[in-house]
């Protein structure tokens, strides 16, 4: 492990030198590439340097214990030794995690798609609850959200809502939300007070850059139509809504959120690119995913990952068996406790695999 860490530190120093080179500074592509790589390994390098410093302090403390010391001094050095040993062990564990292979998509912005599934009106209302939850979570993280497409219902739910989340590390956190979310509650329209079970599905796609997925104009059919609101009524008379069909994969994306046809097409292209990129990745990872069943689930969007039980004010994440009696807080966007636990479970599983 120490050899790998030293190699990472050497690379960090090399990148530092390159970023001061006038030839690199004048080359925008190289400058961006080197800056990004340096940022990705910075935490590893800083943690490794702390580890080396603590290791030296530990050696000094051990050497002092071998000298002739009075009782008070001996006790003081012994306490320092214990603290340093504990700190060294913590840093070792952190470094093991930092050396795990990174998901190349973790730093990307994301496109989130929420759809009401089983349960009719109640499922669509729950889809709206999930959108509000993620919107609030994004705000707490300092991320920006932007609605790309929304099919609202007259009751205030969503048949489907697609939105973008822009922010550092958005995919690294939100990727754990992929799957089917189940709600158990008494609908407002239920006179008998019976609990209904409904589901909504969440898809989290990393934003794909143009260089990552090559889509030819000739492969896209563009249709325009008038925007419509809840219930299907027309909300404007201009043909501003856009539907894109990627002919080779039969992937269809619509966008009518903007008044401008050009802006709707730009938003639709982002979703189209992300969906095709996701499809390519899913196919490439299918065989690997079969051999490595993640502790946090397969990521399959049909997999039930979480239940929100209103009568018991309970949220249960089925992938890691975590139950919290904090339903209201979770729906207010306080997802850190759940997502942090999923990250730890994922890292633990990855460490086991690395040690095999």
UniProtKB/Swiss-Prot annotation:
Pfam families: PCRF (PF03462), RF-1 (PF00472). SMART domains: PCRF. PROSITE patterns: RF_PROK_I. It comes from the Bacteria. Keywords: Cytoplasm, Methylation, Protein biosynthesis. One of its GO terms (cellular component) is cytoplasm. The keyword Cytoplasm applies. GO terms for molecular function: translation release factor activity, codon specific. InterPro entries: PCRF, Pep_chain_release_fac_I, Pep_chain_release_fac_I_sf, Prokaryotic/Mito_RF, RF-1. Methylated by PrmC. Methylation increases the termination efficiency of RF1. It is found in: Cytoplasm. The modification N5-methylglutamine is found at residue 233. Its main location: cytoplasm. HAMAP family: Rel_fac_1. Peptide chain release factor 1 directs the termination of translation in response to the peptide chain termination codons UAG and UAA. Belongs to the prokaryotic/mitochondrial release factor family. This is Peptide chain release factor 1. The lineage of its organism: Bacteria, Bacillati, Bacillota, Bacilli, Bacillales.
């Amino acid at each position: 492990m120490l050899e790998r860490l030293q190699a990472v530190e050497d690379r960090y120093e090399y990148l530092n030198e390159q970023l001061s080179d006038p030839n690199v500074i004048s080359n925008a592509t190289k400058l961006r590439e080197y800056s990004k790589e340096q940022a990705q390994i910075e935490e590893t390098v800083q943690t490794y340097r702390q580890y080396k410093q603590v290791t030296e302090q530990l050696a000094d403390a051990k050497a002092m214990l071998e000298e002739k010391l009075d009782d008070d001094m001996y006790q003081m050095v012994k306490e320092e030794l214990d603290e340093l040993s504990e700190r060294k062990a913590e840093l070792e564990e952190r470094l093991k995690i930092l050396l795990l292979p990174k998901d190349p998509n973790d730093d990307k912005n994301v496109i989130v798609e929420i759809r009401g599934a089983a349960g009719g009106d109640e499922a669509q209302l729950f889809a709206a609850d999930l959108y509000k939850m993620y919107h609030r979570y994004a705000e707490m993280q300092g991320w920006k959200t932007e609605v790309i497409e929304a099919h609202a219902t007259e009751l205030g739910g969503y048949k489907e809502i697609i939105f973008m989340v822009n922010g550092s590390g958005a995919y690294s956190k939100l990727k754990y939300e992929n799957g089917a979310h189940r709600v158990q509650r008494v609908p407002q329209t239920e006179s008998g007070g019976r609990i209904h079970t409904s589901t909504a599905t969440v898809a989290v796609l990393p934003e794909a850059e143009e260089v990552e997925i090559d889509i030819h104009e000739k492969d896209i059919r563009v249709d325009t139509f008038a925007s419509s609101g809840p219930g299907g009524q027309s909300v404007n008379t201009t043909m501003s809504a856009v539907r894109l069909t990627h002919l080779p994969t039969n992937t269809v994306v619509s966008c009518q959120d903007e008044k401008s046809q050009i802006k709707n097409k730009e938003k639709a292209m982002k979703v189209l690119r992300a969906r095709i990129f996701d499809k390519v990745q899913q196919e490439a990872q299918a065989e690997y995913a079969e051999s490595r069943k993640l502790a946090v689930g397969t990521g399959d969007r049909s997999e039930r990952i979480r239940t929100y039980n209103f009568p018991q004010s309970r949220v249960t994440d089925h992938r890691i068996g975590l139950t919290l009696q904090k339903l209201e807080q979770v729906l207010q966007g306080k997802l850190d406790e759940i997502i942090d636990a999923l990250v730890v479970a994922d890292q633990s599983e990855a460490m086991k695999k690395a040690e095999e």
